[in-house]
Swiss-Prot record:
It comes from the Eukaryota. It is found in: Plastid, Chloroplast. Belongs to the universal ribosomal protein uS4 family. It comes from Gladiolus papilio. Residues 82-143 form the S4 RNA-binding domain. This is Small ribosomal subunit protein uS4c.
Length: 197
């Protein structure tokens, strides 16, 4: 993880650790020597590691975004941001996306009153996300919410009630609230050169 953030910059979904202040400057100095391919590859890797996706999963999302109306890059980011594991992370109900994925896999999370154990579940506006009514589930979420560093930065498409361990999806995310510094067009470009998008 440290190597990844040193090379790619802050990846809040993967870890709360941040690169040392000098490493950004080193990366910029090195970027003068980087090829266009390498720049596109690094943006793609940044996206993949932040959201914790396999190469195949990310490629699938790029294909879905490519078939939808609108900007492929913007739609790609919306698809990734509306995943259940990411929504839990953005709500502060988990400290990282891998941590959120574990909560979902272990059946601690309900969407609209039903257990959902698929981290890639695509959340929709008006979805209500709660924790199972069990002491262990509530204790896990309570710890995450209490120690969450990004509570005050909650994006405007989400609302949380920390006392009821309940999150609400208000709308599809607006691109300015994406939780990662990324040039999504370079990611789309990377894949369009690799495949027939």
């Amino acid at each position: 993880r440290f190597k990844k953030i040193r090379r790619l910059g802050a990846l809040p979904g993967l870890t709360s650790k941040r690169p040392r202040s000098g490493s950004d400057l080193k990366n910029q100095l090195r970027s003068g020597k980087r090829s266009q391919y390498r720049i596109r590859l690094e943006e793609k890797q940044k996206l993949r590691f932040h959201y914790g996706l396999t190469e195949r999963q990310l490629l699938k999302y790029v294909h879905i975004a490519g078939k939808a109306k609108g900007s492929t890059g913007q739609i790609l980011l919306q698809l990734l941001e509306m995943r259940l594991d990411n929504i839990l992370f953005r709500l502060g109900m988990a400290s990282t996306i891998p941590g959120a994925r574990q909560l979902v896999n272990h059946r601690h999370i309900l969407v609209n009153g039903r257990i959902v154990d698929i981290p890639s579940y695509r959340c929709k506006p008006r979805d209500i996300i709660t924790t199972k009514n069990k002491q262990r589930s509530k204790a896990l979420i309570q710890n995450f919410i209490a120690s969450s560093p990004h509570q005050e930065e909650l994006p405007n498409h989400l609302t949380i009630d920390p006392f009821q361990y309940k999150g609400l999806v208000n709308q599809i995310i607006d691109s300015k609230w994406i939780g990662l510094k990324i040039n999504e067009l370079l990611v789309v470009e990377y894949y369009s050169r690799q495949t027939d998008l």
